[in-house]
Amino acid sequence: MTIALGKFTKEENDLFDIMDDWLRRDRFVFVGWSGLLLFPCAYFALGGWFTGTTFVTSWYTHGLASSYLEGCNFLTAAVSTPANSLAHSLLLLWGPEAQGDLTRWCQLGGLWTFVALHGAFGLIGFMLRQFELARSVQLRPYNAIAFSGPIAVFVSVFLIYPLGQSGWFFAPSFGVAAIFRFILFFQGFHNWTLNPFHMMGVAGVLGAALLCAIHGATVENTLFEDGDGANTFRAFNPTQAEETYSMVTANRFWSQIFGVAFSNKRWLHFFMLFVPVTGLWMSALGVVGLALNLRAYDFVSQEIRAAEDPEFETFYTKNILLNEGIRAWMAAQDQPHENLIFPEEVLPRGNAL
């Protein structure tokens, strides 16, 4: 019996090894295996968005002008969602709707599904890029884990929410004013601001901004350079080998301010990671709930009392009336294909009126 010792060696010209060597080579812009997903998808998503906002109308899907060619500016231009009648069709260029006609495909809203799907895979490719680079230089993968927060929000808002509704029509269009319209829609039809998952998301994002500002200011406050005292600008010298700020001084400062302070850098920075990412995850979970039409908090007793007593009104009941107003006024404007008509007497008014 023959026993072979050592590693099994492949042929030198193995195609996988050649590709791996080229993709992961040290260059100015790292490509990597993740780049095979990231770069094409990012290119097509951005290219589709610039094309749509420059040339493509939303007249056939929303009855709106949405391109620079029609007179919109950066804040009002958008790549709009497909018509409600198209439901959840992928709207492939070669599909039964467009039948290979590029003009018809753009008119039907095909660019929206094109941008949304390529954008989602582009974001996933960027997260995989962070995993791949972290593995290459032997780092932990927390950057990629952190980036899962924005991905979760994007996928939940642009893909899962409209999948739970009647079609892509109810997703946000890709534009600044279009996103604002979608926020108003979320408030009017889902009372989103009173949703506990939205509250957790706001706490996470604003809390992270506060932590970031405090952390940056504290590090700047305690910069030092050995032998030169507290000289902020000399401490920026990148050739200094030692640590450039004093954790001990920072701890003493915040202990006096709040009575408590972080004494461990790892816990401090994990907390700065945990707060925003958890907030984004919670927001994404909330939007998934809205896709299923789960309700936010309802304080029915206040609504009943406000209906019975003209002198009783709370900020909650006023907001509920505002939501009714948004629904009544917005539905007719936002869904012209439904031919909704609300007579004046059914439009909501506050108790003062």
Swiss-Prot record:
Keyword Protein biosynthesis: no
Example of a GO cellular component annotation carried by this entry: photosystem II
Binding site for pheophytin a: 130, 143
Modified residues (N-acetylthreonine): 2
Membrane topology annotation: Multi-pass membrane protein
Subcellular location: Plastid, Chloroplast thylakoid membrane
Listed GO biological process terms: photosynthetic electron transport in photosystem II
Residue positions where Phosphothreonine is found in the record: 2
Listed transmembrane segments: 41-61, 125-141, 153-166, 208-228, 279-295
Misc note: 2 of the reaction center chlorophylls (ChlD1 and ChlD2) are entirely coordinated by water.
Family per record: Belongs to the reaction center PufL/M/PsbA/D family.
UniProt name for this protein: Photosystem II D2 protein
